């Protein structure tokens, strides 16, 4: 379990108050593979998602399109175990150091790839350079 559930004297989680939330109450989050340093994905968290992530040791994001908490892997089984939660120097970006579970190597992207950052700009065009590890249609039934 992560060591960030310390409550202030008034019962509130004071460490959450140090995060600079945007006007919608969200903070951008980067998920990075702890073992390799690979950047897996970018997402958003609200206060509840960040608190749940710290409590569970599992990545919980806020889905802007669904308007609700999104427990990473709830549909795909591709869960992210969180080893460390970091806050950047401006307190407005969160970095999760994770182990991506559910497939070997771990699949973080809904396209069936290890990382959501699979396109590289080459000669003025975006080219997919990382392979699809599993057909998304077989992941999301």
From Swiss-Prot:
Note on how the cofactor is bound: Binds 1 Mg(2+) ion per subunit. Binds 1 zinc ion per subunit.
GO molecular function: magnesium ion binding; phosphoribosyl-AMP cyclohydrolase activity; zinc ion binding
GO cellular component terms attached to this protein's record: cytoplasm
Broad enzyme group: hydrolase
Keyword Transport: no
Catalytic activity: 1-(5-phospho-beta-D-ribosyl)-5'-AMP + H2O = 1-(5-phospho-beta-D-ribosyl)-5-[(5-phospho-beta-D-ribosylamino)methylideneamino]imidazole-4-carboxamide
UniProt pathway annotation: Amino-acid biosynthesis; L-histidine biosynthesis; L-histidine from 5-phospho-alpha-D-ribose 1-diphosphate: step 3/9
InterPro entries with a match to the protein in the record: PRA-CH, PRib_AMP_CycHydrolase_dom, PRib_AMP_CycHydrolase_sf
Binding residues annotated for Zn(2+), in chain numbering: 89, 109, 116
Cofactor(s) demanded: Mg(2+); Zn(2+)
Subcellular location, record wording: Cytoplasm
Alphabetical keyword list: Amino-acid biosynthesis, Cytoplasm, Histidine biosynthesis, Hydrolase, Magnesium, Metal-binding, Zinc
EC nos: 3.5.4.19
GO biological process annotation, one example: L-histidine biosynthetic process
Pfam family, one: PRA-CH
Primary location group: cytoplasm
Binding locations of Mg(2+): 88, 90, 92
Subunit structure: Homodimer.
Function: Catalyzes the hydrolysis of the adenine ring of phosphoribosyl-AMP.
HAMAP family per the UniProt record, alphabetical: HisI
Protein family: Belongs to the PRA-CH family.
PANTHER family membership: HISTIDINE BIOSYNTHESIS BIFUNCTIONAL PROTEIN, HISTIDINE BIOSYNTHESIS BIFUNCTIONAL PROTEIN HIS7
Protein's name in the database: Phosphoribosyl-AMP cyclohydrolase
Organism listed in the record: Paracidovorax citrulli (strain AAC00-1) (Acidovorax citrulli)
Gene: hisI
